[in-house]
């Protein structure tokens, strides 16, 4: 072990490692170009979250969403839910490659959006299995097991007890 530089007489500033960076070296990444995906049949998958169940058909197209016969803007007016639904397509950079037809049943908007995200991610790995690591890393292939806890008798809600009086 050597002493710190200020106490080491043999150490000079010239001995320190110097990193040389070339100015003309560019870091621009070329835009990823994907070949159009060819699938022989529509890919059908199911996603679930809370009480919501979503059945998705993925077909090659222009990035159009049809949810229970309505557009994504009509079905999910909340931008957060729209962004949540589109996130698997954004992750694999295929937002304009597929049309998505979905049938959503049960639950509320948040549960349906989560179920739709899972179904889209599952459909994408059926089309292109090499996208699986990116989707898995982003957490899109994990089924969220959380659901509403049941109400117990003797309690007002699942865990809320009636007021207790000591005397």
UniProtKB/Swiss-Prot annotation:
Signal peptide interval: none
Bias-annotated ranges (Basic and acidic residues): 143-152
A cellular component annotation (GO) from this entry: cytoplasm
Similarity comment: Belongs to the universal ribosomal protein uS9 family.
Region (Disordered): 136-167
Pfam hit, one: Ribosomal_S9
Species assigned in the record: Nocardia farcinica (strain IFM 10152)
Gene: rpsI
InterPro entries the record matches: Ribosomal_Su5_D2-typ_SF, Ribosomal_uS9, Ribosomal_uS9_bac/plastid, Ribosomal_uS9_CS, Ribsml_uS5_D2-typ_fold_subgr
Residue spans of biased composition, Basic residues class: 153-167
Superkingdom, taxonomy of origin: Bacteria
Molecular function terms from GO: RNA binding; structural constituent of ribosome
Protein name, per record: Small ribosomal subunit protein uS9
Keywords: Ribonucleoprotein, Ribosomal protein
Keyword Ribosomal protein recorded: yes
GO terms of biological process kind: translation
């Amino acid at each position: 072990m050597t002493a710190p530089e200020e106490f080491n007489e043999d150490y000079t500033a010239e001995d320190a490692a110097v990193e040389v960076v070339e100015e003309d070296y560019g870091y621009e990444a070329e835009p990823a170009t994907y070949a159009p995906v060819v699938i022989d049949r529509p890919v059908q998958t199911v996603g679930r979250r809370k009480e919501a169940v979503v059945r998705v058909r993925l077909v090659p197209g222009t990035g159009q969403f049809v949810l229970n016969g309505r557009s994504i803007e009509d079905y999910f007016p909340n931008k957060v839910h729209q962004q949540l639904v589109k996130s698997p397509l954004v992750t694999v950079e295929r937002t304009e490659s597929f049309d998505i037809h979905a049938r959503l049943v049960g639950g509320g908007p948040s549960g349906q959006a989560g179920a739709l995200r899972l179904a889209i991610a599952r459909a994408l790995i059926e089309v292109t299995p090499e996208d699986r690591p990116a989707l898995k890393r982003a957490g899109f292939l994990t089924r969220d097991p959380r659901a509403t806890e049941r109400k117990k008798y003797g309690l007002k809600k699942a865990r809320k007890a009636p007021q207790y009086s000591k005397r």
